[in-house]
């Protein structure tokens, strides 16, 4: 019952997300992105080779996977020129930085559940949060939530499992 899990865990977040505007980068972040772009635009044409995307992203502290890079390139380089302008690069990096913020938000939520600091969300943790949020869920429904998120079968939800289940929601 992922929907209950999502509901129980992000009641206040939903309202906040609806009210907050799309994430904006700070001037400092934009400057860092510009510097990384300029570093690879050695000939000053205002474009970089799409093959340099991974290296440029790494210079900004990201470790993109090969499949992720291929997907980004196919979305950006629709004409197959092999080049990317600053605007495209800024769009990609804004999205990546937003994802990084999202992960941090999810991990903060995880810590709220994991009040006993075991590194896992137990049935007891989930029951406490549901009660605090005024969610009237049966033990069976709570256990179903744990079972749905629990990939390694240990009966609890670790950070990776929590990230996975939360990213499946439309809340993040």
UniProtKB/Swiss-Prot annotation:
Residues the record lists as binding Ca(2+) 2: 150, 152, 154, 156, 161
Alphabetic keyword roster: Acetylation, Calcium, Cell cycle, Cell division, Cytoplasm, Cytoskeleton, DNA damage, DNA repair, Isopeptide bond, Metal-binding, Mitosis, mRNA transport, Nuclear pore complex, Nucleus, Phosphoprotein, Protein transport, Repeat, Translocation, Transport, Ubl conjugation
Pfam short name (any one): EF-hand_7
Modified residues (Phosphothreonine): 26
GO biological process assignments: cell division; centriole replication; microtubule cytoskeleton organization; mRNA transport; nucleotide-excision repair; protein transport; regulation of cytokinesis; spermatogenesis
Top-level lineage group: Eukaryota
Cited SUPFAM superfamilies: EF-hand
InterPro entries: Centrin_CML-like (IPR050145), EF-hand-dom_pair (IPR011992), EF_Hand_1_Ca_BS (IPR018247), EF_hand_dom (IPR002048), RNA-helicase_DEAD-box_CS (IPR000629)
GO cellular component: 9+2 motile cilium; apical part of cell; centriole; centrosome; ciliary basal body; cytoplasm; glial cell projection; nuclear pore nuclear basket
N-acetylalanine: residues carrying this PTM: 2
GO terms of molecular function: calcium ion binding; G-protein beta/gamma-subunit complex binding; heterotrimeric G-protein binding; microtubule binding
Sequence segments annotated as region (Disordered): 1-31
UniProt-annotated stretches for the region Required for self-assembly: 2-25
In-chain residues carrying the UniProt-annotated modification Phosphoserine: 20
Boundaries of every EF-hand domain copy: 28-63, 64-99, 101-136, 137-172
Residues reported to bind Ca(2+) 1: 41, 43, 45, 47, 52
Family statement drawn from the similarity comment of this UniProt entry: Belongs to the centrin family.
Biological function: Plays a fundamental role in microtubule organizing center structure and function. Required for centriole duplication and correct spindle formation. Has a role in regulating cytokinesis and genome stability via cooperation with CALM1 and CCP110.
More info: Binds two moles of calcium per mole of protein.
Protein name, entry field: Centrin-2
Species annotation: Bos taurus
Gene for this chain: CETN2
């Amino acid at each position: 019952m992922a929907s209950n899990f999502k509901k129980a865990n992000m009641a206040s977040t939903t309202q906040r997300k609806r009210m907050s505007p799309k994430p904006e980068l700070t001037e400092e972040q934009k400057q860092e992105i510009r510097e990384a772009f300029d570093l690879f635009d050695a000939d000053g044409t205002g474009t970089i080779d799409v093959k340099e995307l991974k290296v440029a992203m790494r210079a900004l502290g990201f470790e993109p996977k090969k499949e992720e890079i291929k997907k980004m390139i196919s979305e950006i380089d629709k004409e197959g020129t092999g080049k990317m302008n600053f605007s495209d690069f800024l769009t990609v990096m804004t999205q990546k930085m937003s994802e990084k913020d999202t992960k941090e938000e999810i991990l903060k939520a995880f810590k709220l559940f994991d009040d006993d600091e075991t590194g896992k969300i137990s049935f007891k943790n989930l029951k406490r949060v549901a009660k605090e949020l005024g969610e009237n869920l049966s033990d069976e429904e709570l256990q179903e939530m744990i079972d749905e998120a629990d990939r390694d079968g240990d009966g609890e939800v670790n950070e990776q499992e929590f990230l996975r289940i939360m990213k499946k929601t439309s809340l993040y």
